[in-house]
Amino acid sequence: MAELAQFAKMNGLGNAIIVADMRGRADRVRPEAAQRLASDPATHFDQIMAIHDPRLEGTENYIEIINSDGSVAQACGNGMRCVVQRLAAETGRPSFTFETIAGVLSAEEHANGLISVDMGKPRFGWQDIPLAEEFHDTRKIELQVGPIDKPVLHSPSVASMGNPHAIFWVEDDPYSYDLERFGPMLENHPIFPERANITIARVDSPEELTMRTWERGAGLTLACGSAACAAAVSAARTGRTGRGVKVNLPGGSLEILWRDDDHVIMTGPAEWEFSGRFDPATGAWERETEGAA
């Protein structure tokens, strides 16, 4: 067995996260190790946030994001808050800058324990999301579920927060839709060459949304931070809301602000559950401590 790596089992509004400390190591978390951890009820996760040594000058760490199916993800807002909470507890510092596959992100822990992450700038071009077909206006694209004359879901807004998102707007309860059925089909629709995160969202007021998400590579989730950001900017872009909204998710609420400089700021909590050690090659693990940090 290889030398074990430290990890913290955490959650961001119920979005199950493993923060893996891979600093000082040359190896990576292998897909089969991720799948093994995800299949264990004690360590089941939506994303692994693997903290590596910095590769880019001016950043503290490189963060690799791994889905529960072993695939690599470009963004995970809830996971970034968990990383910040752990590193802030370790270093006593409130602010950090990270490199991810999607670019550089900055984050800060506030005195009240909430954590803000600058998720960067959204992208709306069809090639940037990406889509398999050209759409000049991605505020609403041609895509539907159900009969042509009476679709169940249709005309989503699409956007990228470093990862692709489709947001279906509804006027009734987002929980009344069978997302467990529609989610996999839409995630893997040919229009999305890199697959997509699928969200059903309702506008409650000009300052509030309610939504739920089928997460690419992870499935139904209690919270998806990048999806909340994508829904918030899409709501503002289509005139449904202002640029600052409260987003209600199954696991709780996030505050999303689309600033005038085009950066999207996500604010919410992170919670530690227990710590342990694991083998990044196989996923074998052992528990060390548990309880609230």
Curated annotation (Swiss-Prot):
GO process terms (BP): lysine biosynthetic process via diaminopimelate
Compartment(s): Cytoplasm
Keywords in alphabetical order: Amino-acid biosynthesis, Cytoplasm, Isomerase, Lysine biosynthesis
Enzymatic reactions: (2S,6S)-2,6-diaminopimelate = meso-2,6-diaminopimelate
One MF term in the entry's GO annotations: diaminopimelate epimerase activity
Binding site for substrate: N15, Q47, N67, G77, N78, N163, N197, E215, R216, G225, S226
This protein's pathway: Amino-acid biosynthesis; L-lysine biosynthesis via DAP pathway; DL-2,6-diaminopimelate from LL-2,6-diaminopimelate: step 1/1
Site (Could be important to modulate the pK values of the two catalytic cysteine residues): H165, E215
Gene Ontology annotations for the cellular component aspect, listed alphabetically: cytosol
E.C. number: 5.1.1.7
Active site location: C76, C224
Subunit field text: Homodimer.
Functional description taken from the UniProt entry: Catalyzes the stereoinversion of LL-2,6-diaminopimelate (L,L-DAP) to meso-diaminopimelate (meso-DAP), a precursor of L-lysine and an essential component of the bacterial peptidoglycan.
Family to which the UniProt record says this protein belongs: Belongs to the diaminopimelate epimerase family.
Protein name per its UniProtKB record: Diaminopimelate epimerase
Originating organism: Chelativorans sp. (strain BNC1)
Gene: dapF
